[in-house]
């Protein structure tokens, strides 16, 4: 059936390419776009359809077709493994407020983990955003006791030892606690918790020590890692994680929590999402433990979704934006030069709800340059939306929010669908080329 579809597609493309057809250039371009949309809808099977979406642009762009080879090799090994092997593929998706809410990344995580080819290796990186007095993802609850203060990389007045999340919570009370409880969300039950990593600067002698509050007989092992985390493996799956503190020396005065990773011992996809409201590329360069925690996460794919806040001011330094991304790419490759890197362009926005933002197109152009110059992949969501002023159309059909910056929950779900389909399509092409039957 797929072979027949491909033949039909090529036939239609050939017909549209015949110069003798009496179409003017504009008509031909429009008909080609409509054909591309139809082809993609046919190949993607069932998906939500919206007239405002440029489905023909929904593809992974690469100068070098090998840009995602490392990730696809790992994905294929996971897909074809024996059950007892329990391999995991790790994805780190970093960004700003679009990522902190986890609507977009949550949908992608769900699609990967519910795909029978891959499986569920856990919720991944989490943070007690509620303790930091900011919005928490909806698939887990945060509870805490004691007084906690937040330190954010986006605040110039804040100074802290940040990791990949770019946000910390701190306390001076050794009796303070934090609990993370995954919950059912959108009819999806939470992943089981068989292993947890608590990230904090363990080499800082002035910090209290982190401990897991759980029955001793449910803890199989505990180990402190020099990469800056306490790893606890459970003998019984947990439904929530409670973190306590232990003051073991008079020199200890406070505690800094950088994040918590919730994992299983099964094979599957571990999709970490880290983002903070207002984040720009330059802010991630303030994170002292960024590379250290990258080494501990060992991502096979790093997705970078930044640019909305860089491009928001009227005076946008697109050269600095590109330079900061180069530094982030270099940090990733310092840890593993083979790690696949996928950039995503920011969505179209307005400033103050009424001024169309020309800078987003500049950001998209710099990302195109990076794709060509740094052998990274690009998912051009700006083009998929429809480009300049497209957020207006997205808002009209319920896909964008009134602020003309963020998408609605429906919009983020659609974005997740599109992103996953683009990756999956490129993965299938890779299999056809490198693992032919």
Q: Which residues does each PLM region occupy?
A:
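Bacterial Sec-dependent N-terminal signal peptides
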Residues: 1-38
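Short N-terminal segments immediately surrounding and downstream of signal-peptide cleavage
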Residues: 26-54, 341
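Coil residues (strongly favoring Ser/Thr
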Residues: 38, 65-67
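Short hydrophobic beta-strand that contains or immediately precedes a catalytic carboxylate
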Residues: 91-95
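Conserved SGNH/GDSL esterase-like catalytic core that processes O-acyl groups on lipids
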Residues: 100-212, 218, 222-323, 406
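Solvent-exposed, polar/charged alpha-helical surfaces in well-ordered, non-transmembrane soluble domains
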Residues: 102, 106-110, 288, 292, ...
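Active-site segments of SGNH/GDSL-like serine hydrolases
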Residues: 303-309, 330-365, 380
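Catalytic His-Asp segment of secreted/periplasmic serine-dependent ester chemistry enzymes
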Residues: 348-437
């Amino acid at each position: 059936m797929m072979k027949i579809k491909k033949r039909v597609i090529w036939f239609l493309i050939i017909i549209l390419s015949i110069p003798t057809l009496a179409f003017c250039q504009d008509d031909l371009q429009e008909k080609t776009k409509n054909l591309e949309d139809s082809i993609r809808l046919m190949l993607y099977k069932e998906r939500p359809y919206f007239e405002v979406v440029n489905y023909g642009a929904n593809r992974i762009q690469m100068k070098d077709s090998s840009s995602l080879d490392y990730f696809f090799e790992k994905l294929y090994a996971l897909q074809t493994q024996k059950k007892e092997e329990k391999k995991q593929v790790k994805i780190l998706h970093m960004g700003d407020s679009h990522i902190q809410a986890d609507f977009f990344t949550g949908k992608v995580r769900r699609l990967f983990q519910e795909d029978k080819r891959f499986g569920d290796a856990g919720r991944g990186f989490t943070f007690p955003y509620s303790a930091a007095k900011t919005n928490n993802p909806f698939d887990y609850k945060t509870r805490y006791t004691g007084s906690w203060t937040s330190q954010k990389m986006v605040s110039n007045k804040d100074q802290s030892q940040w990791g990949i999340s770019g946000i910390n919570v701190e306390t001076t009370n050794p009796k303070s606690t934090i609990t993370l409880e995954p919950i059912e969300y959108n009819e999806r039950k939470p992943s089981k918790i068989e292993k947890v990593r608590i990230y904090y600067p363990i080499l800082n002698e002035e910090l209290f020590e982190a401990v897991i509050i759980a029955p001793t007989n449910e803890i199989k092992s505990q180990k402190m890692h020099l990469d800056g985390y306490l790893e606890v493996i459970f003998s019984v799956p947990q439904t929530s994680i409670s973190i306590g503190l232990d003051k073991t020396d008079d020199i200890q005065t406070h505690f800094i929590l950088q994040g918590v990773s919730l994992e299983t011992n099964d094979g599957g996809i571990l999709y970490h999402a880290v983002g903070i409201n207002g984040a720009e590329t330059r802010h991630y360069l303030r994170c002292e433990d960024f590379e250290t925690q990258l080494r501990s996460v060992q991502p096979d794919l790093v997705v970078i979704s930044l640019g909305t806040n860089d491009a928001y001011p009227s005076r946008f330094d697109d050269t600095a934006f590109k330079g900061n991304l180069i530094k982030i790419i270099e940090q990733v490759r310092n840890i593993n030069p083979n790690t696949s890197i996928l950039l995503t362009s920011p969505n179209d926005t307005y400033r103050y709800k009424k001024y169309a933002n020309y800078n987003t197109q500049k950001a998209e152009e710099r990302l195109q340059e990076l794709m060509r110059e740094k052998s990274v992949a690009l998912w051009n969501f700006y083009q998929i939306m429809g480009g300049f002023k497209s957020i207006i159309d997205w808002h009209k059909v319920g896909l964008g929010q009134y602020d003309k910056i963020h998408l609605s929950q429906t919009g983020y779900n659609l974005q997740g669908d599109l992103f996953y389909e683009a990756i999956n399509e490129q993965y299938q092409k890779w299999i056809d080329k490198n693992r032919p039957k």
